[in-house]
Curated annotation (Swiss-Prot):
Keywords: Ribonucleoprotein, Ribosomal protein, RNA-binding, rRNA-binding. Belongs to the bacterial ribosomal protein bL9 family. PROSITE patterns: RIBOSOMAL_L9. Transmembrane segments: none annotated. GO terms for biological process: translation. Binds to the 23S rRNA. Disulfide bonds: none annotated. This is Large ribosomal subunit protein bL9. It comes from Thermotoga sp. (strain RQ2). PANTHER family: 50S RIBOSOMAL PROTEIN L9. Coiled coil: none annotated. One of its GO terms (molecular function) is rRNA binding.
């Protein structure tokens, strides 16, 4: 029996693939559990259309991420924090703080998960920060942490 997989099935195939399986396996396991549907040309067209929509969505997401990254790389972003005499920060600068501060200055909507920090920043100075945006867009931006007046 020909089936179209609705999910990835180990040792059978990936979502959207058309596979030939035994009738019993399809009727007793794959179809009742929602892993597959019986093959029809209409269903195949619908799945191809769905894949095309998903592909376009990912492409738009990547383009949007590239625009955001281009805007982020234009300048060194300044984050002002309260600090003591030795350049030690009261508290720490986290990814959430960076996203919030950079959003204020650029007007872009940023997510804290896009900023990759090994550990929170605890001293004043300049830092290169890895940014990983949706759509697989990655690069580094410059951050300068300054004392708040």
């Amino acid at each position: 029996m020909k089936v179209i997989l609705l999910r990835d099935v180990p040792k059978i195939g990936k979502k959207g693939e058309i596979k030939e399986v035994s009738d019993g396996y399809a009727r007793n396991y794959l179809i009742p559990r929602g892993f597959a549907k019986e093959y029809t040309e209409g269903l195949e067209r619908a799945i191809k259309h769905e894949k095309e929509i998903e592909k376009r969505k990912k492409e738009r997401e990547r383009e949007e991420s590239e625009k955001i990254l281009k805007e982020l790389k234009k300048r060194t972003h300044v984050v002002k924090v309260k600090a003591g005499e030795g350049g030690k920060i009261f508290g720490a600068v986290t990814a959430a703080t960076l996203a919030e501060e950079i959003s204020k200055t650029t007007g872009l909507k940023l997510d804290k998960r896009w900023f990759k920090l090994d550990k929170p920043i605890k001293e004043l100075g300049e830092y290169s920060l890895e940014v990983s945006l949706p759509g697989g867009v990655k690069d580094t931006i410059k951050i300068r942490v300054e004392r708040e007046e």
